[in-house]
UniProtKB/Swiss-Prot annotation:
Pfam families: UDG. Belongs to the uracil-DNA glycosylase (UDG) superfamily. UNG family. The active site is at D65 (proton acceptor). One of its GO terms (molecular function) is uracil DNA N-glycosylase activity. It comes from Bacillus anthracis. This is Uracil-DNA glycosylase. InterPro entries: UDG_fam1 (IPR002043), Ura-DNA_Glyclase_AS (IPR018085), Uracil-DNA_glycosylase-like (IPR005122), Uracil-DNA_glycosylase-like_sf (IPR036895).
Length: 225
């Protein structure tokens, strides 16, 4: 599962692929992919980093582990492949977006448009066994994605971290650089969205911060496919 990242993440993360934890993770993943159905496809594991380079990252939306149903996961947190029903948490994200900006809820959950504008859609665990949420938790991915967060924390140019729910908020300890901004609320999951996600206006908060920095704002509207 070693991967040559084709943008500026490549040299930054190359040392991770040589560390003992990643070698053990690599052995585990080869076994998992050869004996079980695992998501996403091998070639999609690092899509978040491929779509959103280090220098171009303006915003990070932190997720947990990939969707574990057929044809859903493709390497971006919260996003699903075209032609797949929009999952409940993402539907709530769209409802909040509609309330903030008046955008219609799209007919898909394909968030590549966000990634291409500098929104790093990063899960803390990058693979999962079909039908078994958190099945690859504690196997090494957390070390790797913590390093991604640490590298962004080291950047002088500000990054806006969106932390929804306790799992994402546990990563706050890695964000120590005062240049960066944190936006947080409960998770958009149907279990918690009404306890403070709805009405939290994360998308317009991001764009206000970007505008104040003289940076281009994110066009959050996802087109129909």
């Amino acid at each position: 599962m070693k991967h040559v990242l084709k943008n500026d993440w490549g040299p930054l993360l190359a040392p991770e692929f040589e560390k003992e934890y990643y070698r053990e993770l690599d052995v585990f993943l080869k076994e998992e992919y050869s004996t079980h159905v695992v998501y996403p496809k091998i070639e999609d594991i690092f899509n978040a980093l491929e779509y959103t380079s280090y220098e171009n990252t303006k915003v990070v939306i932190l997720g947990q582990d990939p969707y574990h149903g057929p044809n859903q996961a493709h390497g971006l947190s919260f996003s699903v492949q075209p032609g797949v029903k929009t999952p409940p948490s993402l539907l709530n994200m769209y409802k909040e977006l509609r309330d903030e900006y008046g955008y219609d809820i799209p007919n898909n959950g394909y968030l590549v448009k966000w990634a291409e504008q500098g929104v790093l859609l990063l899960n803390t665990v990058l693979t999962v066994r079909q039908g078994e949420a958190n099945s690859h938790k504690g196997k090494g991915w957390e070390h790797f994605t913590d390093r991604v967060i640490e590298l962004l924390n080291e950047r002088e140019k500000p990054v806006i971290f969106i932390l929804w729910g306790r799992h994402a908020q546990a990563k706050k300890k890695l964000i120590t650089n005062p240049n960066h901004q944190i936006i947080e609320s409960v998770h958009p999951s149907p279990l918690s969205a009404r306890r403070g996600f709805f009405g939290s206006k994360p998308y317009s908060k991001v764009n206000t911060i970007l505008a104040n920095m003289g940076e281009g704002e994110i066009d959050w509207e996802i087109p129909n496919l």
